[in-house]
Each structure stands twice: as C-alpha cells, then as structure tokens.
Amino acid sequence: MEIDFFNSQCQSVSNKKRFGLCDEQDDKEPAYLDERNGAKWIAVVENDELKEVHFIAIDYCIEIWRDDDPTKMEKRCDGMLWYETSIIFVELKDRVSKKDKNAWVEDGEKQLKCTIAYFEKTEQSDKFTEKRVYIANKAHPTFKESQLQRMKNFKQETGYTLRIENRIKIPSY
C-alpha cells in the first residue's frame, strides 16, 4: 500500500522570514514548526522571500511499517519541508555523542535514507525537482569535520543533496 506523505494531521505552514523546527527529544510526540520560541529551535529555516513553506511531521505521525516485519514500525526521519517544487527531509538531533562523535550523523543518515526510500516509491515524489535532506543538531550547529565524501555518497545513492547543519535556507530563484 502506498504511503500518503501529504495527508497528515501533523502539518503546518509558515511564510515568516525565520522560523524553527523543534522536537522534544524524549517524548513520543511529533516534531513541529515554531515561529516564536527560538530557544527551542533545533533547525532554523531562513526564508528571505517569505515563501509559503509547509512542514509535515513524519516520525510519530505517518505510519511506515517495515517490509520484513509488518508488526514493527520503520525508523523514520522527523519531518519534511516542502514549497513549490522543492522538498527537504529533516532529521533533528539535540545531543552530543560522547563515545562516537559521528554516531548522531550516522543515525540521522539511516533514518533519512529509510524515509526517502518509501517516499520515492510514491507518485508524490515525481512533482519535486529539488530534493534535499538535512541532519540538524542543536548541540553541533556547524559540523567541524569534513563530510564531503559522505555527502557525495548520499547523493549518488539517493539523488538527494545532504547537508549537516542546522540552518536551512529557502533559496530565491
């Protein structure tokens, strides 16, 4: 059965110049768009042209059941932004890994790849020409280590551009 990523109760819209994406990390609630409380923002969306940008929570909102075990839920990313013909899948992190400094990146990458794989099986994916993903971590707003090879591999495997940062720019064309 095809998953409808756009028929979600967990959808909000903003045309503000700056707004944030939030996720209360330990509760079982969906991520959400916030226009007021910057202290809670894990990712900051910069929307200089005031475009109408939609956010749809995926984790804890859209059910994606595993193919190999239909009684278990698949790992999903936190949500997606879309506007015009662009789509951006987002994984929000707010933690530092003490043991492995890349663990949160690897974890986020797996969640994004899994969600994208299901999205690409839908006809809905055909209407988007620009496809990006972000792994945003409030504890690491800019990632120090070069991830160029990881980003190149991600693009080759999925067709999506990967960014590891917590500033999401809505470009002007």
Task: Label the model's feature ranges.
Residues 1-71:
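Basic, amphipathic N-terminal segments that precede the first structured/catalytic domain
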Residues 2-10, 132-173:
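Domain-level recognition of nuclease-like catalytic cores that cleave nucleotide substrates
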Residues 51, 97-104:
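Intrinsically disordered, low-complexity coil segments
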Residues 59-67, 73-76, 82, 124, ...:
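Electrostatic, structured charged patches in enzyme active sites and in nucleic-acid/phosphate-binding
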Residues 79-81, 86-97:
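Conserved catalytic cores of phosphodiester-cleaving nucleases, focusing on short active-site segments
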Residues 95-99, 140-143:
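Short acidic, S/G/P-rich loop/turn micro-motifs used as interaction or catalytic elements
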Residues 101-139:
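Catalytic cores of nucleic-acid endonucleases
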